[in-house]
């Protein structure tokens, strides 16, 4: 696998970003640019990655195409289309978003409507519409799994891939987001193995993080955290990823704020990988 993440830290442009990239030791990164970034600046970021043999693994959308505000929803949809078009032009394999929600609580919030048949059909239409507008050849549009939003299981994701029925719709793996109940948490290694076994042919990018649940506090609270701060068995999980994914599969750390936090998490996983003969 190619272990990496988001390059964090203070930078004002590609030159300072490149310095952080080198220090990070990342082999794969999220795109530090978007469709709104001036092309000269985008090209400078890409050149920095090329100089150091780093793969730009994914470009994010992270906007709610089902926003209850029609203007915001339309803007989000146009951004998704633009990001996918940019990814395809630049050869970035994964353009990732979440399915969307009509909740007023937030762009990625839980809502009773998230699991209705009407919403499921709307997701299919939305994904098809985005892909059909762009007609990508190299990039894939993917949905990140969410604890309270489709897709929320490997079987659900497989069914969605079949129902969308577009060759450029693929999978973005976030197994911690799908560890959304005590059963999956307590059998996390087995569940992650199931995710990889079923979805590996479709996975274009993977997020890696940790999770924890207090064993006696009621009621259940599952808390995402950085690798090493939770209870996941990364020796076994890295082996699953190593055996189940291609050697050049990007595996990305996320949701940290500072360079130091990413550095610590990367070092933790790199140490485990080294102890177990796993190439990153």
Regions of interest found by a model, annotated:
Residues 7-15, 31-44, 64-74, 103, ...:
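Acidic-and-aromatic substrate-binding clefts and catalytic sites of carbohydrate-active enzymes
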Residues 14-17, 42, 76-80, 120-123, ...:
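Aromatic/hydrophobic pocket-lining residues that form the small-molecule binding cavity
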Residues 50-51, 70-171:
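Active-site acidic/histidine proton-transfer and metal-coordination neighborhood
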Residues 1-93, 117, 128, 166, ...:
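N-terminal pre-domain/capping segments
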Residues 5-9, 31-35, 58-63, 97-99, ...:
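A cross-domain feature marking catalytic cores of carbohydrate-active enzymes
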Residues 111-119, 150-167, 222-237, 260-276:
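Short, electropositive alpha-helical surface patch
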Residues 19, 29, 59, 125-225, ...:
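Acidic/histidine-rich catalytic cores of soluble enzymes
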Residues 26, 89-92, 138, 203, ...:
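A structural motif
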